Amino acid sequence: MPSQSVLVIGGGLAGLSSAIALADAGFRVQLLEKRPHLGGRATSYTLPDGSEVDNCQHVTLGCCTNLADFYRRVGASEKIRFYDRLYFVDREGRRSEIQASPLPPPLHMAPSFLLFDALTLADKRSIAVAMLAIARGGGNPPRTEGATMLDWLHSMRQTTGAIERFWRVVLVSALDEELARTDAKYGIEVFWKGFLSNALGYRVGIPSVPLAELYEGCREAIAKRGGEVRARCGVRRLCVQGDRFAGAILENGSEIEGDACIAAVPHDVLLNLTPREMAEPGAPLEGLRHIKTSPITSVHFWFDRTVMTEPFLTLLDHTTQWIFNRTLLSSGIETNGSKVRPTGHNEGTPGGEVRVERDGGDEAQYLQLVISASYDLVQRSRAEIIELCRRELADVLPATREANVLKATVIKEVNATFSPEPGVDRWRPAQTTPIDNLFLAGDWTQTGWPSTMEGAVRSGYLAAEAALTHFGQPTELLQPDLPVEGLCKYWARRSASGTN
């Protein structure tokens, strides 16, 4: 059994990824999580009636290489289903799809983009100009320094329709912030890595199980190395002696020791765990007080019949941004195109609908709606939010007008992500600290990514790398981005050499 032990405080993706990496490297890891479930902000809850729901539907993209590596390490890769088509619907009920063609990047999306019904020709022309600027700049176009994404779009002469029906739709969902409060750097990065530089970057991966089930392999992997995962185990404060971490005081008053510690908790929680002098003016954690957060609201509906055949929909011109067909996504039935394709006999109807039986023998369907940057909903009652979403469902899914709602619930994550406002990077600390054996993990640390699951895993790997270096075992854990392909590869080289 390894003689060196590492405490990991926090069982979200940042803590789990660092813990798994260290366990794989032979260290004895003790992971402490305050809540009963692992996953942090990407987890599941059990309702009083026994239904298990995600706090908010989380998705990955093909460009999230470190998250994919983490899922592989914990045996969860097969629980993620990837989709090659993105489905959109506007207030008039018009459907549009975006998918890659055989053309090389950045042209691979062009054929389906040209057929996107919700955009006018002028909208498409302006979007093409901005996309070309991103591609020719190798993901780093001019006029972005200190600018918001909205500023940059205006500088690129984007039409109102392009901003509201394309840029805003994609970016508010991806970054959980409004365009006027988003650093242009991060907005552009979403399109460069997800839609332009590689033909696989845009593919949407959705868990086929409740989020908490994705992390079941973590306990076993850590235990195999002599470690332990302790849920319902909160930490009151970290003990520091001189310039070294000495241990942690738990909420029950007991103390636990370790040869090193990775603090993988939300940035505001960290301030309450660490010595006060670490957050004083000029100290390493001073900037954490300046990091703002953004809310996400999820709304869950159970209908008495099938009302939706697509696996998911992105809504235009609505408060609701995404609808996820959880009945279909959890069914094990594969989809090909916009209709359901059963994998076996008698699993679907001729029209492509998936039929899920209730106890009474009737059809039932569970939909989850997601609203990012939901500032306007934070103070509204759950009844008001449910009514709003029910009206919007009727716009895009006519079958819901006659369907009965068996039950509905609302989950608000008021501090779901950190806000990627211009200049936020100056407040984000590194994974190392002045305390020799204390390291930080969290999407709010310096990862080069915004507040995403990919960013959380990157932080975990970087913290584990720092810990391994501390123990004299330097190891590279961070996975490379998808390769830049097609014309983008040529433009990226020219941009890097300063010849663009």
Residue ranges with predicted function:
Residues 23-48:
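Glycine-rich FAD pyrophosphate-binding loop
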Residues 4-31:
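N-terminal Rossmann-like FAD-binding beta1-loop-alpha1 element of flavoenzymes
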Residues 324-334, 413-440, 444-447:
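FAD-binding beta-loop-beta segment adjacent to the flavin cofactor pocket
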Residues 468-500:
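Active-site-proximal substrate-binding core of FAD-dependent oxidoreductases
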Residues 2, 234-339, 343-346, 350-353, ...:
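Mid-domain catalytic core of redox enzymes
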Residues 190-252, 259:
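Helical element adjacent to the flavin cofactor pocket in flavoenzyme catalytic cores
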Residues 174-175, 388-433, 484-485:
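Flavin (FAD/FMN) cofactor-binding core of flavoprotein oxidoreductases
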Residues 67-68, 72, 77-188, 199-201:
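Mobile amphipathic helical/loop "lid" adjacent to a hydrophobic cofactor/ligand pocket
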